[in-house]
Amino acid sequence: MILVLDFGSQYTQLIARRLRESGIYAEIVPFFESVENIQKKAPKGLILSGGPASVYAKDAYKPSEKIFDLNLPILGICYGMQYLVDFFGGVVAYANEQEFGKAILEIVQNSVIFEGVKIKSLVWMSHMDKVIELPKGFTTLAKSPNSPYCAIESDKIFGLQFHPEVIQSEEGGKILENFALLVCGCEKTWGMQHFAQREIVRLKEKIANAKVLCAVSGGVDSTVVATLLHRAIKDNLIAVFVDHGLLRKNEKEKVQAMFKDLQIPLNTIDAKEVFLSKLKGVSEPELKRKIIGETFIEVFEKEAKKHHLKGKIEFLAQGTLYPDVIESVSVKGPSKVIKTHHNVGGLPEWMDFKLIEPLRELFKDEVRLLGKELGVSQDFLMRHPFPGPGLAIRILGEINENKIKRLQEADAIFIEELKKANLYDKVWQAFCVLLNVNSVGVMGDNRTYENAICLRAVNASDGMTASFSFLEHSFLEKVSNRITNEVNGINRVVYDITSKPPGTIEWE
């Protein structure tokens, strides 16, 4: 196992992900993790991440100096390398010629860390400081046009000024793999088959004969959680799916069919009337979210009580992922709010369940791989993200059944055409928004005054930033024609070409 010490870089999670993609298990801890805790984890090597600070600043992030007493191989990346240089007596200073973006790395000295790596390759830089003078005992391994010391080595200690974890670094994955396998002696033992087998055994031991309540949204995380739990505890899993009437077209039926194929009993609650009655007359986005969250808890509580009376429920399953765990112990200290799974936060006191989080070690892409390992269909696993409040935040203004139906039909056409054109898997997320404006149109010889639909499609890697998708005009024309001809009450279709930032992906 490789342990990554986080100094606050936006790329830290990518380090662990790249290693895991190579079959090497990696964990992330804050830079101030105690040496005692590091020893308990028994890593075979340490990686010091990048970070936004300068090593010569008064408040610079610095780990315990005792990490060097562990006699472990260490790789410093960007700030991590500069910390190593500063600690061992070298000089780091503000760079007059800073490097951001792509640069050419040229290897000038053979090293095990560059085994099988091209002499010249593209790398990703992001630094304002640079190494001016190496400490005694360090050797230069590589350079870039503006960094004479772009990679350095001293015995089992290595430094890289660039970011090998970023996909733009052509040989970055190979370099990280070399450090883990050839320097640290790790083995490729990490994978979802191994994880599934281990986790099923662990869940059986932890839960025994107790009952577990799991809220299912129809999304990837909750479906994989339910599938994993069912493999472990069979019918002691109580999976609850709340239909709030704000789902995509045929969503309920698709979720039910999926769980039937997986042979997992699913308790479906039709709460459409309850939700829509409480949302009547509400147009403010945050109030919509609040009402949906509170109503979900009421409905979920009522259903939980029924099962609680039949046999005490001891556990509540949540789809916490590894990024949530990292966030809670970030370099800035514990977060004030830990994200909970779907709408399960704020449950009443009587529901004093123990939490069980089977996915807390996994990244999102690993959850999909685990789902595939467990037999969840690929089509289901690769579906686009869908917000917890559902179509409520894609209908601008007040919500009613007619608006929901219009949006469901338009959205289904858009998604269907994306799949026909083999575009669905090429965009990160696509959906329709029902605008709260009417516009004048002409159909036949008649004047119309009807709703407008907005098409939204974006490309992204994680949703933190996004750019609108460049869809062909002929494709957009086809979708527009179908929607205006097939969906009653729609006479205009527009395409959103806003990126994030300045806009958000969802409209509300």
From Swiss-Prot:
Provide a Gene Ontology MF annotation, just one. Answer: GMP synthase activity
For the Glutamine amidotransferase type-1 domain, which residue ranges apply? 1-189
InterPro entries in the record, alphabetically?
Class_I_gatase-like, GATASE, GMP_synth_C, GMP_synth_GATase, GMP_synthase, GMPS_ATP_PPase_dom, NAD/GMP_synthase, Rossmann-like_a/b/a_fold
Which positions bind ATP? 217-223
The reply on keyword Cytoplasm is: no
Please state the pathway this protein functions in, per its UniProt record: Purine metabolism; GMP biosynthesis; GMP from XMP (L-Gln route): step 1/1
The GMPS ATP-PPase domain sits at: 190-383
Q: What is its EC number?
A: 6.3.5.2
Question: Which Pfam families does the annotation name?
Answer: GATase (PF00117), GMP_synt_C (PF00958), NAD_synthase (PF02540)
Q: Which GO terms describe its cellular component?
A: cytosol
Catalytic residues, per the record, are 78 (nucleophile), 163, 165
Q: Which branch of life, at top level? A: Bacteria
Q: What does this protein do, in the record's words?
A: Catalyzes the synthesis of GMP from XMP.
Quaternary structure and interacting proteins, as annotated = Homodimer.
Q: Which HAMAP family did the record assign? A: GMP_synthase
Q: Could you tell me what this protein is called?
A: GMP synthase [glutamine-hydrolyzing]
Source species taxonomy? Bacteria, Pseudomonadati, Campylobacterota, Epsilonproteobacteria, Campylobacterales
Q: What gene name is given for the protein in this entry?
A: guaA
